[in-house]
């Protein structure tokens, strides 16, 4: 029997090169840390694609399309083309790299510019919290920035799996709640949110994916 999913969300992962975006995605989608010498942790060239189903409520699954973007400047033109069709994003910095934190606002402003006229929901992620002894960014600083920018904040580690599952769950649930409120809508020509596959026998979930007659976006 085919897997049931009520929505598909396209999420983008952005931030400076070497902050660990690819390792986070490997941990979330494959349940493992690829290791620093693995090609999986090499800087991304262009954009890589991952996917996974996430159950946010009993019997309600969201299909996540996850786009891992290159942090290097020479690939930014490729990255920008993916903003517009994303409903959510992980803004990742390395807590042991001050510069990556200082660039967060630049990434955010760029994303807001290219996502127009659609809405994108962000989660600020302080990665590599297993290296707390090498921390260059305090939790208080990161929490203040996230509050100023209207985002939630979480610290993660792909190496020991700290808060990896939680971070994807938080962002997915936030988007799902906004859809239920009518603040994010399925729209023709936009790939950010799509209705999912629901067998005819599952009437309760079927109702959840019917397009709204009104949209308050």
From Swiss-Prot:
Record annotation: effect of changing residue 72 to L: Constitutively active (GTP-bound) mutant. No change in subcellular localization under autophagy-induced conditions
Cofactor: Mg(2+)
Domain of life of the source: Eukaryota
Cellular component annotations (GO), alphabetically ordered: autolysosome membrane; cytosol; Golgi membrane; lysosomal membrane; phagocytic vesicle; phagocytic vesicle membrane; plasma membrane
Coiled-coil boundaries: none
Annotated spans, Switch-I: 39-47
One example GO MF annotation: G protein activity
Record membrane topology: Lipid-anchor
UniProt region (Switch-II), positions on chain: 71-87
Main localization category: membrane
The keyword Metal-binding is annotated on this UniProt entry: yes
KW Metal-binding (keyword) present: yes
Catalytic activities: GTP + H2O = GDP + phosphate + H(+)
InterPro entries named among the record's database cross-references: P-loop_NTPase (IPR027417), Rab39 (IPR041818), Rab_GTPases_membrane_traffic (IPR050209), Small_GTP-bd (IPR005225), Small_GTPase (IPR001806)
Role, per record: The small GTPases Rab are key regulators of intracellular membrane trafficking, from the formation of transport vesicles to their fusion with membranes. Rabs cycle between an inactive GDP-bound form and an active GTP-bound form that is able to recruit to membranes different sets of downstream effectors directly responsible for vesicle formation, movement, tethering and fusion.
Assembly and binders: Interacts (GDP-bound) with C9orf72; C9orf72 acts as a GEF for RAB39A. Interacts (GTP-bound) with HOPS complex components VPS39 and VPS41, and STX17; interaction between HOPS components and RAB39A contributes to obtaining a functional HOPS complex that promotes membrane fusion driven by STX17-SNAP29-VAMP8. Interacts with BECN1. Probably associates with the PI3K (PI3KC3/PI3K-III/class III phosphatidylinositol 3-kinase) complex. Interacts with UACA. Interacts with isoform a of RASSF1. Does not interact with isoform c of RASSF1.
NCBIfam families xrefs: small_GTP (TIGR00231)
Protein name per the record: Ras-related protein Rab-39A
């Amino acid at each position: 029997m085919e897997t049931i999913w009520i929505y598909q969300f396209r999420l983008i992962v952005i931030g400076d090169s070497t902050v660990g975006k690819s390792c986070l995605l490997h941990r979330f989608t494959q349940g493992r840390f690829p290791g620093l010498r693995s090609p999986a942790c090499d800087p991304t060239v262009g954009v890589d694609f991952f996917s996974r189903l996430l159950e946010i409520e009993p019997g309600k699954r969201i299909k996540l399309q996850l786009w891992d973007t290159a942090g290097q400047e020479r690939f930014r033109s490729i990255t920008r083309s993916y903003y517009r069709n994303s409903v959510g994003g992980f803004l990742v910095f390395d807590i042991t790299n001050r510069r990556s934190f200082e660039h967060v606002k630049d990434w955010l402003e760029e994303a807001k510019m290219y996502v127009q006229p659609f809405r994108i929901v962000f989660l600020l992620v302080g990665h590599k919290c297993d290296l707390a002894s090498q921390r260059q960014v305090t939790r208080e600083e990161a929490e203040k920035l996230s509050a100023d920018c209207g985002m939630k904040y979480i610290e993660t580690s792909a190496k020991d799996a700290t808060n990896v599952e939680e971070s994807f769950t938080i962002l997915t649930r936030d988007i799902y709640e906004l859809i239920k409120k009518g603040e994010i809508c399925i729209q023709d020509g936009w790939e950010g949110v799509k209705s999912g596959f629901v067998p005819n026998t599952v009437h309760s979930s079927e109702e959840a994916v019917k397009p709204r007659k009104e949209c308050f976006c």
